[in-house]
Swiss-Prot record:
Its EC number is 2.7.1.50. Catalyzes the phosphorylation of the hydroxyl group of 4-methyl-5-beta-hydroxyethylthiazole (THZ). It comes from Lactococcus lactis subsp. lactis (strain IL1403) (Streptococcus lactis). Its cofactor is Mg(2+). This is Hydroxyethylthiazole kinase.
Length: 250
């Protein structure tokens, strides 16, 4: 049974600490893929929600210092309860965010980290230019992904024109990029959510990370072909393609 088939059978619950820019898109991505999205911003319900969740996805896109106790508690509980823990380290090389993530990593282990080349370079202690959340570098930086995986112990998904998935010893590549991913804010957040959904039903997180990234990219390419040069129509068509793929395996 494929991972996508397992998602349709289990309908995993994905707990998200989402940013306040793209929560609807994140929830839609999980739901259209066959999972069940759940968001929280309340620390008092952390244990209950992590207990019932099948995976946890945390996104630092709009963090403030007051969020740290919630993030720490949720992440620690995910580790304690052996729930896959996925980090989306938005603009992590900005000092406040870097400090926030460093503090978290002293206390918890992330199972999968999904970011662009500049964000992944930070985990590898390498230099990489960035602009906001979009990496300027276009070269494939396989070494950064591998070193980041070795340093963090996480499976790394480095997204770009060619996506690199590394466990520190082996790399897999996905070459299904769409220019409309970059234009539509939140596509990276959606990918992290899809990764969490795949990880929730798989014992092999490296395989889950690869298959989620491939599934996401293929759906994006198909959607791009249909919207032509109308990027405002992309996300809706993209979600349609995700849903159609799930129906083909039922």
């Amino acid at each position: 049974m494929s991972i996508l088939e397992k998602i349709q059978e289990k309908q995993p619950l994905i707990l998200n600490l989402a940013n306040f820019v793209t929560p609807q898109r994140v929830a839609d991505a999980i739901s259209f893929a066959g999972g069940s999205p759940l968001m929280t911003a309340e620390i008092s319900e952390s244990e209950t929600l992590v207990e019932i969740a099948d995976a946890v996805v945390v996104n630092i896109g709009t963090i403030s210092e007051k969020d740290y106790p919630l993030f720490l508690t949720i992440c620690q509980l995910a580790n304690q309860k052996h729930k896959p823990l996925i980090l989306d380290p938005v603009a992590v090389n900005v000092p406040f965010r870097a400090n926030f993530v460093k503090r978290l990593m002293q206390e918890v282990k992330f199972d999968i980290i999904r970011g662009n080349s500049a964000e992944i370079a930070w985990f590898a202690d390498k230099e990489s230019l960035n602009k906001g959340i979009d990496a300027l570098e276009s070269n494939l930086e396989v070494e950064h992904a591998r070193v980041a995986a070795q340093k963090t112990g996480a499976v790394i998904i480095q997204t770009g024109k060619v996506d690199v998935i590394s466990n520190g010893f082996e790399e897999l590549f996905v070459e299904t990029d769409s220019p409309l991913f970059k234009i539509n804010v939140g596509c990276g957040d959606m990918l992290s959510a899809i990764v969490g959904t795949f990880a929730a039903v798989s014992d092999d997180l490296f395989k889950a990370a690869y298959e989620a990234t491939e599934f996401f990219g293929e759906s994006g390419v198909k959607a791009t072909e249909q919207v032509e040069n109308l990027p405002g129509n992309f996300v809706n068509r993209f979600l349609d393609k995700i849903y159609q793929a799930t129906q083909e395996v039922i």
